[in-house]
Design a protein with these regions (language model features):
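Domain-level signature for soluble enzymes in the chorismate/prephenate branch of the shikimate pathway
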Residues: 1-180
Length: 180
């Protein structure tokens, strides 16, 4: 992340970049940040009037990734599908806390089709929570799919695929100054 008139580079965890750019902009400091599109979209769902904008999308292409890039996915036991779970009966879903808002939005769409979910926020190891029987399904990022397969899970649905994004405050970067 860059801030101020002098060029300063600050390092934060990817999930903290949107809040950091927002906080700096709120303190009247010009800042940009590089993060995942999924994390940026999740932040915007929490803070709709943040004034943050996408300045540039950098396409993520990796042939080692299961879907070519990180994908937020609905995961469940291998050999089953979401349709195998009865509608109208509560299903426990472990949601990675990094993607809580994107996951809730997705699950709300499924609830409109008759599913009932108890949404449980989990700090990491969502796959293990399914394997241990703590939850029926999980929503987490899949990259290579290795940990998912090792846990005996498979992708039931892709919720969101993610690229890199450069973000900033509309106040500093929107329109008049532009972004190179």
């Amino acid at each position: 992340m860059l801030s101020s008139n002098a060029l300063n580079t600050l390092e934060f965890r990817a999930e903290d970049i949107p809040l950091s750019v927002y906080s700096l902009a709120s303190s009247n400091k010009k800042a940009i940040g590089l993060t995942g599109e999924d994390l940026f979209r999740d932040f915007l769902l929490k803070k709709r009037n943040s004034g943050l904008i996408l300045l540039k999308k950098v396409i993520w292409e990796d042939r080692n990734a299961l879907f070519g890039k990180p994908a937020l996915c609905l995961l469940g036991p291998k050999g089953k599908a979401l349709n195998d779970f009865p509608k109208g009966q509560e299903l426990r879903v472990g949601i990675s806390t990094k993607y809580k808002e994107l996951a809730k939005k997705y699950l709300n769409q499924l609830e409109s089709k008759g599913y009932i979910f108890r949404k449980l926020a989990i700090n990491g190891c969502c796959e293990t929570a399914v394997t241990a029987g703590l939850v029926d399904l999980a929503i987490d990022i899949v990259y290579t799919g290795k940990s998912m397969q090792e846990a005996g899970l498979e992708v039931y649905d892709r919720v969101f695929t993610s690229d890199f994004v450069i973000i900033g405050s509309k106040r500093f970067w929107g329109g008049k100054n532009g972004f190179p």
